[in-house]
Amino acid sequence: MNKKLIYLLFFIPFISQNIKAQNINSEKNDSLYKDFKTEFIWEAKVKIGKTIDIGESKCGTRRVIPITGGTFSGPKIKGEVLPGGEDWQLVRPDGDTELYARYLLKTNEGHIFQVINNALIHVGDTNKSFYCKSVLDIEAPNNGPYGFLNHAIFLGTLKLPELKQNEEPYVIISVYKVL
């Protein structure tokens, strides 16, 4: 019998039981994830350029927003948002917006890492029901002080501030590590 097949037959039941055990509290039959705890990592002021409207596609309305720079800071990290990233958006037929942003951050010590931010934006009947949550994938150098960013799940929020007259457009992204 093939070694890979034997391996799969042996480990799949173990893995599936282990996953089930991690997700369900056997005493209450509740998800263990209902009480997430997070740690604030940074807040970024991300400057954005003029929207490039691609138009209607088979999936909805496509647009791209250039990321032109910015800054970020948190209790253990501080630096700049490098220009050159992009925020790809899809406005779905139901009105929600899917966001895929990819950009680089550079710390004050010169360490550069990549951020991929996947978000969902939903605006309800009133502007008070604005919902925007994201999951971030952060790729940092392993051998530096920020290698810990490679080993966690990060959640984010997005705020659209009111701009002052002649102020360059920007968004505020807050990032939290799931503990």
Feature locations, PLM:
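Bacterial Sec-dependent N-terminal signal peptides
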Residues: 1-24
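Beta-strand-enriched cores of mature, soluble protein domains
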Residues: 22-179
